[in-house]
Amino acid sequence: MNTVEQNRKDFVAFVRKQLNKCGIKLNLRASKKHLDGDYGMFCEPDHGAELCVASGMSRDKFFHTLAHEYVHFLQWFADDPLYRASRDDARDYYALEKVTEESALEILDQWGLIPESGQDRIRESSEKYLCSVFVRVPSVRVSRKPLPHKGIKNVKKT
């Protein structure tokens, strides 16, 4: 098994273990998209207690999505004010997704989850996703800096 594949295996085990500590299930669905039309979603304990990711896509896209949804779990766990505010304000939702994407890309790098050959493609995919969020959300103006996420920095592979 090459290094990237081992890192991926370790990351899935790590995420599953962290979720289990909070009574949240990791649900990997054998489809290209999740039931709601997206690639994945995080449901808080009051709303289903699961982190779902469609696994029927490229491995790079799968791990990008898993990292993104895992960051939402970390935001929920830390009771992040931006995470809470994003439910009620479209501008905060865009800001949240921007911070989430930045953190997900950082996790992908820290864990070595994307081979060199796929890194540019994942960054492009991230930019396209943020553009689509911006287009879907009316009158979005982000005027704040991303909040520091202390917990995200400590997610490095040990």
Provide a role label for each language-model segment:
Residues 1, 48-53, 81-89:
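Glycine-/proline-rich flexible loop or hinge segments
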Residues 3, 21, 154-158:
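N-terminal cationic leader/targeting segments used for protein routing and processing
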Residues 4-22:
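Zn2+-dependent metallopeptidase catalytic core
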Residues 16-61, 73-77:
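Active-site scaffold of zinc-dependent metalloenzymes
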Residues 58-61, 105-158:
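Long, well-structured alpha-helical subdomains associated
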Residues 60, 76-106:
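Post-HEXXH active-site segment of zinc metalloproteases
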